[in-house]
Amino acid sequence: MELVVTSRETGKKSFLKKIRQQGGIPAVVYSAGKSLANITVDALVFKKFLSNLESGALSSTVFSLSYEGRIIKALVKDIQYQITTYDVIHLDFEELVEDRPVKLNIPIRCINAVDCIGVKLGGSLRQVIRAVRVVCKPKDIVPFLELDVRSVGLSQTRKLSDIKIPAGIETITPLKEVAITVSRR
């Protein structure tokens, strides 16, 4: 996802309030734990992007931030919402550097759920874990991990170890954890 961002002033809360009133979202880009740039993201563009995004996929979405003539590859590390309207009021991005590993959550997508044996026999498929915490280099980031549930029968489970993890990705979440279960209704 490409975002055109602009530089912003730092300091008082009144600056941030003015940015929000003008249709922007204040944001900070961090690199190696230190603030790299204070920026503004267009609120309408970001809101439209979020509305089209699959649930849980924001954590593994790589953004290309067009900032002062250069492109910064980054992940959203924190997002703050307004309590009553649920509008985004602040973003934290983490810059991706080629040789520096990054920790992130990659969502799990269950495939072939319609063909699941346990569901066809009247069971209910429940996804226990929605994302896996991993560490990998930026070039190895994938948007989601697939778990094939076609062969899962009634009263059976699949663990994280049943997910095919691509090369270059190391899991932090223990692989013995149950990812999905099919139970009787």
From Swiss-Prot:
Record-level GO BP terms: translation
Q: Which domain of life is it from?
A: Bacteria
Q: Which InterPro entries match?
A: Rbsml_bL25/Gln-tRNA_synth_N, Ribosomal_bL25/Gln-tRNA_synth, Ribosomal_bL25_b-dom, Ribosomal_bL25_C, Ribosomal_bL25_long, Ribosomal_L25_dom, Ribosomal_uL5_bac-type
Q: Which UniProt keywords apply?
A: Ribonucleoprotein, Ribosomal protein, RNA-binding, rRNA-binding
A Pfam entry, by short name: Ribosomal_TL5_C
Q: Which GO terms describe its molecular function?
A: 5S rRNA binding; structural constituent of ribosome
Q: Which GO terms describe its cellular component?
A: cytosolic large ribosomal subunit
> Entry's CDD domains?
Ribosomal_L25_TL5_CTC
Q: Does the keyword Methyltransferase apply?
A: no
The family assignment reads: Belongs to the bacterial ribosomal protein bL25 family. CTC subfamily.
Q: What does this protein do?
A: This is one of the proteins that binds to the 5S RNA in the ribosome where it forms part of the central protuberance.
The record's subunit annotation is:
Part of the 50S ribosomal subunit; part of the 5S rRNA/L5/L18/L25 subcomplex. Contacts the 5S rRNA. Binds to the 5S rRNA independently of L5 and L18.
Annotated protein name in UniProt: Large ribosomal subunit protein bL25
Species assigned in the record: Chlamydia pneumoniae (Chlamydophila pneumoniae)
